Curated annotation (Swiss-Prot):
<feature type="domain" description="ABC transporter">
    <location>
        <begin position="2"/>
        <end position="245"/>
    </location>
</feature>
<comment type="function">
    <text>Part of the ABC transporter complex PhnCDE involved in phosphonates import. Responsible for energy coupling to the transport system.</text>
</comment>
<dbReference type="InterPro" id="IPR012693">
    <property type="entry name" value="ABC_transpr_PhnC"/>
</dbReference>
<dbReference type="InterPro" id="IPR003593">
    <property type="entry name" value="AAA+_ATPase"/>
</dbReference>
<protein>
    <recommendedName>
        <fullName>Phosphonates import ATP-binding protein PhnC 2</fullName>
        <ecNumber>7.3.2.2</ecNumber>
    </recommendedName>
</protein>
<keyword id="KW-0067">ATP-binding</keyword>
<comment type="similarity">
    <text>Belongs to the ABC transporter superfamily. Phosphonates importer (TC 3.A.1.9.1) family.</text>
</comment>
<keyword id="KW-1003">Cell membrane</keyword>
<dbReference type="GO" id="GO:0015416">
    <property type="term" value="F:ABC-type phosphonate transporter activity"/>
</dbReference>
<dbReference type="InterPro" id="IPR017871">
    <property type="entry name" value="ABC_transporter-like_CS"/>
</dbReference>
<keyword id="KW-0472">Membrane</keyword>
<keyword id="KW-0813">Transport</keyword>
<dbReference type="InterPro" id="IPR027417">
    <property type="entry name" value="P-loop_NTPase"/>
</dbReference>
<dbReference type="Pfam" id="PF00005">
    <property type="entry name" value="ABC_tran"/>
</dbReference>
<feature type="binding site">
    <location>
        <begin position="34"/>
        <end position="41"/>
    </location>
    <ligand>
        <name>ATP</name>
    </ligand>
</feature>
<keyword id="KW-1278">Translocase</keyword>
<comment type="subunit">
    <text>The complex is composed of two ATP-binding proteins (PhnC), two transmembrane proteins (PhnE) and a solute-binding protein (PhnD).</text>
</comment>
Amino acid sequence: MLVVEGLTCRFGTKAAVDNASFSITPGGFVGVIGRSGAGKSTLLRMINRLAEPSEGRILFHDQDVTALQGQALRQWRARSAMIFQQFNLIGRLDVLTNVLMGRLAEIPSWRSLAQLWPEKDKALAMSALDQFDMAAYAAQRADQLSGGQQQRVAIARALVQQPDIVLADEPIASLDPRNTKIVMDALLRINKHFGITVICNLHSLDLARNYCDRLIGMASGRVVFDGAPEQLTDQIARELYDLEANEVMGAEHHVPGASSVPELAGAVAA
């Protein structure tokens, strides 16, 4: 189980994440929602330890993740694989090599520098690409792919890390509707077929409701909603997103004079 206890991250006097607490059982597909600047990305980066918490701690199966250093920290980052909005592929390298980068924590650095990847890792990478219909592109340069194809390669790279958790930070933010569905279906496959916990930052409420079995809503760095998608009423969503409600819900949902975020405090699950 992943447990977040009183997690806070401050930049100067501003708290990007403010006393966030929740627990996630293995195998869930959790959507983290909220307006821009709510603290969603910082939360995921702290779970992966790409950002350091100012206060609080993260536990995974009773291990204190916030105390990890050195090799133990590198192993945790492999077990909690990140997928980024920007794909983070190396454009000049072929697709297969980009996926193999997900095995860096498992091999000596001289092997990766010389690109002497073990055959079992190559087979694992090809299998991961095949899961997302990208095996035919294995020899192609990454910068020759479309955005949706690049994100599928990034998901395959995360899969070869053989993670316990996948942390997807706005993975479809720059994609068109067709590629958005393809990428979200790929994340759902990771979750349902492989049983990997997925925590995904999403701006679209429709996608969050359609794909996630639990939603965590953030506002001004705080967790202000935690529950099943069906518990997130349109009224709560309007309060959560405030001025961005039209964008994330569609014009047909807009009701003038929607309430402000502080009223959401009672929506957090006990």
